[in-house]
């Protein structure tokens, strides 16, 4: 069965122009589903609909068998849908723990007043950091980390929401080779726990290595879904661009053109 289904999804940029044109995506539990397409194909737009950042003009989202209206990112997180964006939005002057639970701080009663339960927040943050193999102090300022380390904290934030769906938008763009391997370990563990993972990337080696299924989009439209093991790099590129690679890179002709020049020399000048 599918865990999350988006169907006939349309967003109009302007009258007559659709950023999404009857796009669709079906996610199964415990799978890594690659979403591919050229820049501007609509991949991130589709995912931002699933995460409640954008609202559709047409279409529907079915989650756990029920049609839902995702009102915004916090609503998505509360439902168990998490997204790690390509463009990070960290709060560097706040602690790692605060960044993980921003907008979802645990609370406690202090007399008649409800306050943030900092002890529980840092205790829970330490657990989730350990769960994703990050040896960071949750009390440390986020700004002390590198950009790639901040990206891994974003993944910890998604895991902290006990997500059933995790959307990763170009997750390795700023990671080192060692950090990519660490990310893949996390992805494998989440898949084994039944999490549905959307993986957006232009890196073919990553897609073919980690994905179970691949959906390809072009010009805001759904092109098709295939099992990753059925695909090669050339097949993916052909489906992304809509024509054979041989048409993209036709063989060069060595036949001389109508005009050719040989043995040209330039006149010399001498100083007087």
Locations of regions flagged by a protein language model:
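A short beta-turn/loop motif at secondary-structure boundaries
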Residues: 1, 253-256
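Conserved structural motif at the start of ABC-family nucleotide-binding domains
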Residues: 20, 258-261
């Amino acid at each position: 069965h599918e865990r999350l289904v988006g169907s006939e999804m349309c967003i109009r940029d302007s009258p007559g122009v659709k950023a999404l044109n009857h796009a669709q995506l079906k996610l199964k539990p415990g799978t890594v589903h690659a979403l591919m397409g050229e820049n501007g194909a609509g991949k991130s737009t589709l995912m931002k609909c699933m995460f409640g950042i954008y609202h559709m003009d047409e279409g529907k989202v079915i989650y756990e068998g029920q049609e839902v209206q995702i009102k915004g990112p916090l609503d998505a997180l509360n439902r168990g849908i998490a997204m790690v964006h390509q463009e990070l939005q960290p709060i560097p002057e706040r602690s790692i723990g605060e960044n993980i639970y921003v907008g979802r701080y645990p609370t406690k009663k202090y007399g008649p007043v409800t306050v943030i339960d900092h002890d529980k927040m840092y205790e829970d943050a330490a657990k989730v950091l350990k769960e994703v193999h990050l040896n960071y102090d949750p009390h440390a300022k986020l700004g002390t980390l590198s950009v790639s380390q901040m990206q891994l904290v974003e993944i910890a934030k998604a895991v902290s929401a006990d997500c059933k769906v995790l959307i990763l938008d170009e997750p390795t763009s700023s990671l080192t080779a060692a950090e990519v391997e660490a990310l893949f370990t996390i992805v494998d563990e989440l898949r084994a726990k039944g999490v549905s993972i959307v993986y957006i990337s232009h890196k073919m080696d990553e897609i073919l290595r980690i994905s179970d299924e691949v959906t390809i989009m072009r010009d805001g439209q759904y092109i098709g879904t295939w099992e990753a093991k059925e695909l090669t790099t050339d097949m993916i590129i052909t489906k992304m661009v809509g024509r054979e690679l041989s048409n993209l890179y036709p063989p060069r002709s060595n036949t001389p053109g109508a005009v050719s020049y040989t043995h040209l020399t330039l006149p010399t000048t001498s100083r007087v």
